[in-house]
Amino acid sequence: MNSRLSNSVIKAEAQRLGFFACGMARAQKVDSTEERNLEQWLEQKGHADMQYMAKHKEVRLDPRLLLNGAKTIVSVALNYCPKVTIPQDEPQMAYYAYGLDYHDIVKQKLYALACNLGLHTDPKAARPEDQPFRVVVDTAPILERYWARQAGLGWQGKNRQLI
């Protein structure tokens, strides 16, 4: 297992796998502004009926609690725009709703990234909790947009989306 990889090697392999952006950030507690933003959002019930968003606040604020020993967060972006679109005269739907579930596609590519970087040799050989990494795609209590910003993938607009 390779425990020390350069950012350029990771980015090059991510690009080879089809990710159009990749960046890294040091795994650490979020800054005080982000912590206040999360607390206000929860107090104002910004999560509506998504009760799971109010759980595991400590983990959301410090990703090292999600994976013991975590040192780096690798954030990626993948364009899931379909190759074939619905004709304009037919009812439309969001691109992410086309075809295969993006969670599955991104997760598969992230496991391939780990394998190709020598972090993971056989996805079926060991339990995920035994790995030196953790793959998450909207499925863990982590502030994805914050970490994508920290990794240099964009900035957050007024709509709270990463641009």
Model-identified regions with their sequence ranges:
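Auxiliary alpha/beta "docking" domains used to position bulky ligands
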Residues: 1-163
